[in-house]
UniProtKB/Swiss-Prot annotation:
Binding site residues for ATP 2: G278, S279, G280, R281, S282, L283
Domain of life assignment: Eukaryota
Protein name: Adenylate kinase 8
Cellular component, GO, one term: cytosol
Main location: cytoplasm
Annotated segments matching region Adenylate kinase 1: 58-258
Pfam families given in the database record: ADK
Molecular function in Gene Ontology: (d)CMP kinase activity; adenylate kinase activity; ATP binding; nucleoside diphosphate kinase activity
Localisation: Cytoplasm, Cytosol
Function as written in the Swiss-Prot or TrEMBL entry: Nucleoside monophosphate (NMP) kinase that catalyzes the reversible transfer of the terminal phosphate group between nucleoside triphosphates and monophosphates. Has highest activity toward AMP, and weaker activity toward dAMP, CMP and dCMP. Also displays broad nucleoside diphosphate kinase activity.
Amino acid sequence: MDATRKPLRIPPAMAVYAEEHGVFDIIQKMVEKVLVDRPEDPIQYMIDHLSNDNDDVPRVFILGPPASGKHTMAKLLCKRLNATHLTPENVLSSDVSLLVKEAQSYRDKGQEVPDELWAKLMRERLSQVDCIKRGWVLEGFPKTRDQALMLQMAGVCPGHLVVLDAPDIVLIERNMGKRIDITDGEVYHTTFDWPSDPAVQRNLVEPEGISEEETGQRLLEFHRNIPGLLRTYSKVSKKINVDQPYMDVFSQVLTFVLSKQRSLAPHTPRILLYGPPGSGRSLQASLLAQKYGIINICCGQVLKEAVADQTKLGELIQPYIENDQQVPDNFVLKILTDHLSSLESAKHGWVLHGFPQDTDQAALLKDAGFMPNRVFSLDLSDDVVIERLSLCMTDPVSGERYHSIYKPAPRSEVQERLQQNPKYSEEKVQARLDVYHANADELEEFYQDVIHINADQDPYTVFEFIESYIVSPLPKSLPEEPTSP
C-alpha cells in the first residue's frame, strides 16, 4: 500500500487473510488459555496449543430434569459430532486416577463428593487426548451453581449449554415408564422406546427412584438449582422444549451447538447478492447500505457512471453500453476494483450485485483479491420473475413505475400512457432467466457457503433474513456422517 498515492487503495488481501484464518480469534483464545492454565513455559505452551488445532471442537454441557432425554440427546450429539460422551458416572470409572479413588472413598462412606474434588476430576478427564482432539459432551453436570463456579475456577468452560425442559406432569409420566437394560445400562421406555428384541426385553428392569413422589423431589431440586446455572452460563445457554418428537429436539440441539458465539474480531462485511432478474438484489443492497453504511456497488450502475464521468475506461466501454452489449470482463473488473479497494469500501465494507454472473467472472474477482464473506442467493421461481417484470410499466410523464397487479395506475389517463421497458418483455426476461440458470449451479459450487433466501415474500422480511446472517457468525460446518462398516 503506497500512502503517497491518491486516491488511497487498501489491498484487500490483508483483511481476507486475517478473516479466513481467524487470526484475531486464534490469538484471543491462545491468550485466554495461557492466563487460565498459567504454564511455566508459556511460549512452548502456545506452540503446543496451536499444534493441537482444537479451538473449534465441541465443548457442551447438557442439563435437564429427570426424563428430559439428556442421555439420548448426548448420545446422538456425540455420534453426529464424533465427540466424547461424558457423565459423572463414567468419569468415576477410571481405575488409575488418584482423584477417582479419593472420590470413590467418599461414596463408599455414603458421603457426597465435594464440589472442589468434582472440579478437579472433570479437569483431569477433559485434559485427556480424546477430549482435547475430538471435543466432549458432558451430560448431567454441573448440578448446582457452586459446582459451576468450581469448574470455572478450574478452567473448565463450555462453548454451549443445552437445557432441556418440559412441563413437570410430562416428565413424571415419562419417568415412570423408564426401563434399564441390566447388561449394558441402555435406557428404554415402555411407551416411546420399547425394544423389539425379546432377549433385550427380558433384561429390562425398573430403575430405582422413578416413583411419582421421588421424581417430584428431583424436579424440585432441579428447579431450585437451574436459575443459578443459567446465570452462570447466560451467554452460552439455550432452553429447548422436549415435549415434541425427539428428532425435532435433536435438530434444535444440533443447530444450537453448531452456532458460533459472536466474535470480537474486527468485521468488515463483504457481501455478494445474486439471483434471477427481479429477485430484489438492488433493493436489498440499498437497504443494507442505508442501515449499516455499507458501500452499495451495482455493477451496471458503476459502468454507466464511468461512461458519464468520461473516464478512460468509460470511453472504452461506451460503445458496449450504447449498443446494449456485454462489456468485456477485464474492463468490468478494472472499474469494480477501483470501487472495491477504495478507502470507504475497506472501512465500511461493500455489497456487490450484478457481478459475477458466471464462474469465469468469479475466478477473476477472486484472483484480484476480492472474496465475499457472505454470499446470498435470492431464490425466485421463473413464473414469479416473469410476473414481476413483464407486468411492470413506466409513466413517461412522471417517471413513476407501476405494476398491473401490485401497483396499478391510479387513473385511466395514466394507465393509457404507460409504456413498457423493452428489456422487460416476456421474451427478453425469459432469455435472461436462461442465462442465469445456466450458471447458477456452478456459481454456488464455486462459493460453496451460499445462503439461500426465499425472495418471494415481503422485501423487509427478506432483509431481516439477510441481516441475521450478516450480524452473526456463520454456523460451524457439520462433519461427515459416520459410515457404518
